[in-house]
């Protein structure tokens, strides 16, 4: 072999080694870039998944709140009408307490009163309890000293009846309380 051929073979081997080194370095760089891109894509996917889950949960909450509000509207739909009818019911009660009514008039007023009370009960309106004073249901308009017959925090007299629609207070009872 000639000197030139030996030199060429040597150069080729060096070129192959350099190419091999470059190729390995280039491959490592490419792999590293791909790994970085993959990491970024995974971070982005995780971020979007979290956003999706938050939005999905928020939508479920909005739907749940909407359903609850609709149920509350249906449950308390007659609240305003009931409040207006209560004053008429009070007037009927006062009219029935008047002396000198004929039996027919009294019977007619009682029938109207009973039909109003029945209609209110059908809608869920109930008279509040008068067993003992409850500041959530009663308004104390007067206090009297407690005695054997009326212990402390008991209701002595009811000036105006109180009513509630389901568990919501429509009107507190005006009462006299023993202290």
From Swiss-Prot:
One MF term in the entry's GO annotations: protein homodimerization activity
The UniProt record lists the keyword Iron: no
One Pfam family cited in the UniProt record for this chain: GrpE
Leader sequence segment: none
Region called Disordered, residue ranges: 1-20
Function statement: Participates actively in the response to hyperosmotic and heat shock by preventing the aggregation of stress-denatured proteins, in association with DnaK and GrpE. It is the nucleotide exchange factor for DnaK and may function as a thermosensor. Unfolded proteins bind initially to DnaJ; upon interaction with the DnaJ-bound protein, DnaK hydrolyzes its bound ATP, resulting in the formation of a stable complex. GrpE releases ADP from DnaK; ATP binding to DnaK triggers the release of the substrate protein, thus completing the reaction cycle.
Family according to the record: Belongs to the GrpE family.
Name of the protein described by the UniProt record: Protein GrpE
Annotated organism of origin: Lactococcus lactis subsp. cremoris (strain MG1363)
Lineage: Bacteria, Bacillati, Bacillota, Bacilli, Lactobacillales
Annotated gene: grpE
